[in-house]
Amino acid sequence: MVGIRQYGVFTWVFRTFQLAIDTIVLALASALVNQQTSGGSPGKINFSVAVGSFAILTFFLTAVGRFLPTILGNPWLIAFYDFVNWVFALTGGCCIAVAIRVHACDNQKYLDRNHYTQGSMRRCQELKALCFFLWFMFGLYVASFIVQIFIAKNDTPNYTFRGRGRGKGSGPAVAPRPVMSAV
Protein backbone atom coordinates (compact mmCIF):
# COMPACT_ATOMS: atom_id res chain seq x y z
CA MET A 1 0.00 0.00 0.00
CA VAL A 2 1.37 3.38 -1.00
CA GLY A 3 1.82 5.98 1.72
CA ILE A 4 1.17 3.71 4.72
CA ARG A 5 4.39 4.70 6.49
CA GLN A 6 2.99 8.14 7.29
CA TYR A 7 0.60 6.59 9.79
CA GLY A 8 3.13 5.76 12.49
CA VAL A 9 2.38 6.28 16.17
CA PHE A 10 4.29 9.58 16.33
CA THR A 11 2.43 10.95 13.32
CA TRP A 12 -0.97 10.06 14.74
CA VAL A 13 -0.15 11.56 18.14
CA PHE A 14 1.08 14.71 16.41
CA ARG A 15 -1.99 14.91 14.17
CA THR A 16 -4.31 14.36 17.14
CA PHE A 17 -2.58 17.24 18.92
CA GLN A 18 -3.12 19.35 15.79
CA LEU A 19 -6.79 18.40 15.85
CA ALA A 20 -7.06 19.59 19.47
CA ILE A 21 -5.48 22.95 18.59
CA ASP A 22 -7.68 23.24 15.48
CA THR A 23 -10.75 22.61 17.63
CA ILE A 24 -9.68 25.29 20.11
CA VAL A 25 -9.19 27.79 17.26
CA LEU A 26 -12.63 26.96 15.88
CA ALA A 27 -14.25 27.22 19.33
CA LEU A 28 -12.64 30.57 20.17
CA ALA A 29 -13.45 32.09 16.79
CA SER A 30 -17.03 30.79 16.89
CA ALA A 31 -17.51 32.20 20.39
CA LEU A 32 -16.30 35.59 19.18
CA VAL A 33 -18.73 35.47 16.25
CA ASN A 34 -21.55 34.52 18.63
CA GLN A 35 -20.74 37.37 21.05
CA GLN A 36 -20.64 40.07 18.36
CA THR A 37 -23.18 42.66 19.46
CA SER A 38 -23.49 45.05 16.54
CA GLY A 39 -22.60 45.42 12.91
CA GLY A 40 -22.09 41.77 12.11
CA SER A 41 -18.97 39.75 12.67
CA PRO A 42 -15.68 41.14 11.31
CA GLY A 43 -14.23 39.28 8.36
CA LYS A 44 -10.98 38.51 10.17
CA ILE A 45 -12.83 36.57 12.84
CA ASN A 46 -14.94 34.82 10.19
CA PHE A 47 -11.71 33.85 8.43
CA SER A 48 -10.46 32.33 11.69
CA VAL A 49 -13.61 30.18 11.79
CA ALA A 50 -12.83 29.04 8.24
CA VAL A 51 -9.20 28.27 9.20
CA GLY A 52 -10.28 26.04 12.08
CA SER A 53 -12.97 24.34 10.00
CA PHE A 54 -10.64 23.64 7.07
CA ALA A 55 -7.94 22.26 9.37
CA ILE A 56 -10.43 19.86 10.97
CA LEU A 57 -11.67 18.82 7.52
CA THR A 58 -8.14 18.06 6.33
CA PHE A 59 -7.48 16.04 9.50
CA PHE A 60 -10.43 13.79 8.67
CA LEU A 61 -9.37 13.54 5.01
CA THR A 62 -5.95 12.42 6.23
CA ALA A 63 -7.58 9.88 8.55
CA VAL A 64 -9.71 8.50 5.72
CA GLY A 65 -6.49 8.26 3.69
CA ARG A 66 -5.45 5.47 6.06
CA PHE A 67 -8.20 3.32 4.57
CA LEU A 68 -7.97 4.63 0.98
CA PRO A 69 -4.20 5.07 0.59
CA THR A 70 -4.16 5.26 -3.20
CA ILE A 71 -6.72 8.08 -3.30
CA LEU A 72 -6.49 10.19 -0.14
CA GLY A 73 -3.38 8.70 1.44
CA ASN A 74 -0.93 10.06 -1.10
CA PRO A 75 1.89 11.63 0.93
CA TRP A 76 2.19 14.54 -1.50
CA LEU A 77 -1.53 15.30 -1.12
CA ILE A 78 -1.18 15.30 2.66
CA ALA A 79 1.87 17.57 2.35
CA PHE A 80 -0.31 19.90 0.25
CA TYR A 81 -2.98 19.90 3.00
CA ASP A 82 -0.30 20.77 5.55
CA PHE A 83 1.01 23.57 3.35
CA VAL A 84 -2.45 25.08 2.86
CA ASN A 85 -3.15 24.86 6.60
CA TRP A 86 0.24 26.46 7.22
CA VAL A 87 -0.60 29.42 4.95
CA PHE A 88 -4.13 29.79 6.37
CA ALA A 89 -2.88 29.73 9.98
CA LEU A 90 -0.18 32.30 9.16
CA THR A 91 -2.73 34.56 7.48
CA GLY A 92 -5.23 34.20 10.32
CA GLY A 93 -2.58 34.85 12.97
CA CYS A 94 -1.39 37.99 11.17
CA CYS A 95 -4.95 39.26 10.66
CA ILE A 96 -5.95 38.85 14.30
CA ALA A 97 -2.65 40.32 15.55
CA VAL A 98 -3.16 43.40 13.37
CA ALA A 99 -6.80 43.69 14.42
CA ILE A 100 -6.18 43.67 18.16
CA ARG A 101 -2.93 45.67 18.00
CA VAL A 102 -1.75 43.76 21.09
CA HIS A 103 -2.60 46.16 23.90
CA ALA A 104 -3.28 45.40 27.55
CA CYS A 105 -6.81 44.16 28.14
CA ASP A 106 -7.17 46.29 31.28
CA ASN A 107 -6.80 49.53 29.27
CA GLN A 108 -10.43 50.70 29.03
CA LYS A 109 -9.61 53.40 26.47
CA TYR A 110 -8.22 50.70 24.14
CA LEU A 111 -11.17 48.39 24.77
CA ASP A 112 -13.70 51.11 23.91
CA ARG A 113 -11.98 52.22 20.70
CA ASN A 114 -11.22 48.79 19.23
CA HIS A 115 -13.97 47.44 16.97
CA TYR A 116 -13.05 43.85 17.77
CA THR A 117 -13.04 44.05 21.57
CA GLN A 118 -16.22 46.18 21.78
CA GLY A 119 -15.36 47.40 25.27
CA SER A 120 -15.22 43.89 26.73
CA MET A 121 -12.21 42.58 28.62
CA ARG A 122 -13.42 39.03 28.01
CA ARG A 123 -13.49 39.53 24.22
CA CYS A 124 -10.02 41.06 24.41
CA GLN A 125 -8.68 38.01 26.24
CA GLU A 126 -10.43 35.64 23.82
CA LEU A 127 -8.94 37.51 20.87
CA LYS A 128 -5.46 37.25 22.38
CA ALA A 129 -6.00 33.53 22.99
CA LEU A 130 -7.23 33.09 19.41
CA CYS A 131 -4.14 34.91 18.14
CA PHE A 132 -1.87 32.69 20.24
CA PHE A 133 -3.51 29.45 19.09
CA LEU A 134 -3.43 30.53 15.44
CA TRP A 135 0.33 31.15 15.72
CA PHE A 136 0.78 27.85 17.57
CA MET A 137 -1.24 26.12 14.85
CA PHE A 138 1.04 27.76 12.28
CA GLY A 139 4.10 26.27 13.97
CA LEU A 140 2.54 22.82 14.15
CA TYR A 141 1.69 22.83 10.46
CA VAL A 142 5.17 24.03 9.48
CA ALA A 143 6.65 21.08 11.40
CA SER A 144 4.06 18.70 9.97
CA PHE A 145 4.74 19.93 6.43
CA ILE A 146 8.49 19.38 6.79
CA VAL A 147 8.00 15.86 8.18
CA GLN A 148 5.47 15.06 5.46
CA ILE A 149 7.87 16.21 2.72
CA PHE A 150 10.51 13.78 4.04
CA ILE A 151 7.91 10.99 4.11
CA ALA A 152 6.76 11.82 0.58
CA LYS A 153 10.33 11.88 -0.76
CA ASN A 154 11.03 8.47 0.78
CA ASP A 155 7.87 6.99 -0.77
CA THR A 156 8.60 8.29 -4.27
CA PRO A 157 10.51 5.90 -6.58
CA ASN A 158 14.03 7.14 -7.13
CA TYR A 159 14.71 7.07 -10.86
CA THR A 160 17.17 9.40 -12.50
CA PHE A 161 16.59 10.28 -16.09
CA ARG A 162 19.52 11.42 -18.19
CA GLY A 163 19.55 12.51 -21.77
CA ARG A 164 22.51 10.26 -22.70
CA GLY A 165 21.54 6.59 -22.93
CA ARG A 166 21.70 4.17 -20.07
CA GLY A 167 24.28 4.65 -17.39
CA LYS A 168 24.67 3.56 -13.82
CA GLY A 169 21.58 4.61 -11.87
CA SER A 170 19.61 5.68 -14.93
CA GLY A 171 16.78 3.19 -14.59
CA PRO A 172 16.05 -0.51 -14.46
CA ALA A 173 18.90 -2.86 -15.33
CA VAL A 174 18.99 -4.50 -18.76
CA ALA A 175 20.39 -8.02 -19.21
CA PRO A 176 23.56 -8.15 -21.34
CA ARG A 177 23.44 -9.76 -24.80
CA PRO A 178 24.53 -13.38 -24.86
CA VAL A 179 27.92 -14.04 -26.41
CA MET A 180 28.60 -16.81 -28.94
CA SER A 181 30.28 -19.04 -26.37
CA ALA A 182 27.13 -18.98 -24.24
CA VAL A 183 25.01 -20.46 -27.04
From Swiss-Prot:
Chain spans, region Disordered: 163-183
Function as written in the Swiss-Prot or TrEMBL entry: Involved in membrane organization and might act as a sensor of sphingolipids that regulates plasma membrane function. Involved in a novel pathway of export of proteins that lack a cleavable signal sequence.
Topology within the bilayer: Multi-pass membrane protein
All ranges on the Extracellular side of the membrane: 30-44, 97-131
Ranges annotated as spanning the membrane: 9-29, 45-65, 76-96, 132-152
Any one GO cellular component localisation term in the record: plasma membrane
Swiss-Prot/TrEMBL keywords: Cell membrane, Cytoplasm, Golgi apparatus, Membrane, Protein transport, Transmembrane, Transmembrane helix, Transport
Record's protein name: Non-classical export protein 2 homolog
Subcellular locations according to the entry: Cytoplasm; Golgi apparatus membrane; Cell membrane
Family: Belongs to the NCE102 family.
Main localisation: cytoplasm
Pfam hit, one: MARVEL
One of the GO biological process terms: protein transport
